[in-house]
Amino acid sequence: MRHVAVYAGTRNVYACMAAAAKSLLHECRQIDRVYFLTEDDAFPEELPDVVRCINVKDSFTKAGSVNYENPWTYMTMARLALHRILPDEERVLYLDVDTIVMFACDEIFDADLDGNVIGGVREPKRCLDPFMYVNAGVLLMDLEKLRSGGFGDEMMGIANRRKLKCPDQDAINLICQGRTLELNPIYNASDWTQLPMNAKIYHYAGVRNYTEYKLFKNYMTMKWRDVHASEI
């Protein structure tokens, strides 16, 4: 199974996107492809061959749509359209640009979804059993099932016609309820989920000025050519 990761963001977070991807490539040595979903045809810095930049501006939501203006950016909803944006990929790991891979986590790419369409880490403060609400910052997504079952289009549809507090995340949880595998919190450790000591992926969810943290700054200043050689 291909190990494919996806990041998405507007121009103001391109540097963060690069830093997050560098942390992934530094720790995980079996990555086949990294996609950067951006607003431009070219990235402002030269990228290694494993990284491909795709301009998705206006390809999944239109200015003026009900959730286009939200506390984050319209690009947060790109994850709802991955089944269309990446028609040749069967499965991807979506990561927010404010995530840092702390330790090798190659195994998550091959995790058994047990027939579910996505896997995510629960937000215990946002839900009451039996409703499981997952944080969308790290998602293992079966794009093939999202396409064949129509769930991807359903997520896009509800996000474009119904006002939601957290548009992308709410749409995913509404449509994929009962079709979501709960992942170990080590794969999305944050104040919104849990903070296990052995976390493999840390998510700076809701953290202001996260780029000022030493680890994030180290990856922001790291050269692509040094990703596999540098010690952090």
PLM features per residue range, with description:
Residues H3-V13, A63-Y68:
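Glycine-rich phosphate-binding "P-loop"
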Residues Y133-A136, M197:
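Short, solvent-exposed loop/turn segments at the edges of secondary structure
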Residues F43-R84:
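Active-site-proximal specificity loops/subdomain of glycosyltransferases
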Residues M75-Y133, L140-E144:
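GT-A fold catalytic core of metal-dependent nucleotide-sugar glycosyltransferases
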